[in-house]
């Protein structure tokens, strides 16, 4: 049993024209012709319907108005010629198109189906515009996503060396500190002593300049902590307001000398 389906086409007046599918109408018309009932075309033309009638599959006897409209607009001979030039699987669509156009032509003899064609073309243009707008919006989102991906990639590339430098900067001092605390305490002590000597030398230079301003004879001795201690020679005792300093701690002093100048024997032995 053939399946039946139909399609509806709007008309300008507001009515709907229903067009049956090819399989359903052809099967029904073939069954009607098999019972001896002529098709609508042969009945309208008042002729005997033959088994090989070209109109029988497409113009059933229960819908005579379909052939009447087609015959009035296009003519039976023109329709017969057109159907004979087409393949059998194309004839059903051709007959439905002729029937629809003939019905619209009878409703509007001037424009026919032009109004429906204009409506369909306008709908097609609207859909094309909507599609183009949707593609444009989609392209903007795609460009934004690509820009964000590129920015994140560049950020990751720039942060790579910086992160490595931070890792090295955080790791090396801890390791160096542990290394010094465990195995290099002696080296650390020597470095501290050198720094202390450097500080004492700066202090000694400052005091040396101060003592020269008082026209005294500056002498220095090597202290127990590895630095210099400042004092005045015992020969300066009673020789001015600076004579009260005397020798520092009663220890022997080393007289500071200057290259190219005469040394005076004033240090206590």
From Swiss-Prot:
Q: What is this protein called?
A: LOB domain-containing protein 6
Task: Kindly indicate whether the keyword Nucleus belongs to this entry.
Answer: yes
UniProt cross-references to InterPro entries, sorted A to Z: LOB (IPR004883)
Which Pfam families does the record match to this protein?
Answer: LOB
Q: Name the domain of life.
A: Eukaryota
Q: Give the UniProt family note.
A: Belongs to the LOB domain-containing protein family.
Keywords on record: Developmental protein, Nucleus
Localisation:
Nucleus
Q: What does this protein do?
A: Negative regulator of cell proliferation in the adaxial side of leaves. Regulates the formation of a symmetric lamina and the establishment of venation.
What the entry lists under PROSITE patterns is as follows: LOB
A GO cellular component annotated for this chain's UniProt record is: nucleus
**Keyword Chaperone carried by entry:** no
Q: Domain LOB spans what residues?
A: 37-138
């Amino acid at each position: 049993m053939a399946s039946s389906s139909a399609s509806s086409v709007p008309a300008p007046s507001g009515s709907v024209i229903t067009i049956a599918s090819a399989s359903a109408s052809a099967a029904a018309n073939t069954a009607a012709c098999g019972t001896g009932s002529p098709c609508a075309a042969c009945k309208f033309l008042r002729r005997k319907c033959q088994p090989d009638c070209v109109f029988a599959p497409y113009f059933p006897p229960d819908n005579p108005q379909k052939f009447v409209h087609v015959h009035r607009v296009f003519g039976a001979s023109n329709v017969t010629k057109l159907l004979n030039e087409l393949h059998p699987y194309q004839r059903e669509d051709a007959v439905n198109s002729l029937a629809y156009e003939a019905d619209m032509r009878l409703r509007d003899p001037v424009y026919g189906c032009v109004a429906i064609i204009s409506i369909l073309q306008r709908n097609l243009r609207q859909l094309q515009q909507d599609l183009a707008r949707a593609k444009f919006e989609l392209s903007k989102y795609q460009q934004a996503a690509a820009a964000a991906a590129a920015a994140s990639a560049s950020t990751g590339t720039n942060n790579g060396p910086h992160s490595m430098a931070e890792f090295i900067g955080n790791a090396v001092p801890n390791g160096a500190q542990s290394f010094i605390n465990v195995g290099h305490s002696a080296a650390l002590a020597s470095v501290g002593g050198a720094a202390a000597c450097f500080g004492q030398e700066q202090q000694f230079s400052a005091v040396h300049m101060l003592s020269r301003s008082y026209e005294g004879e500056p002498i220095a001795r090597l202290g127990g902590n590895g630095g210099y201690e400042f004092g005045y020679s015992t020969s300066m005792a009673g020789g001015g307001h600076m004579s009260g300093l005397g020798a520092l701690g009663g220890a022997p002093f080393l007289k500071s000398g200057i290259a190219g100048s005469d040394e005076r024997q004033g240090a206590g032995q």
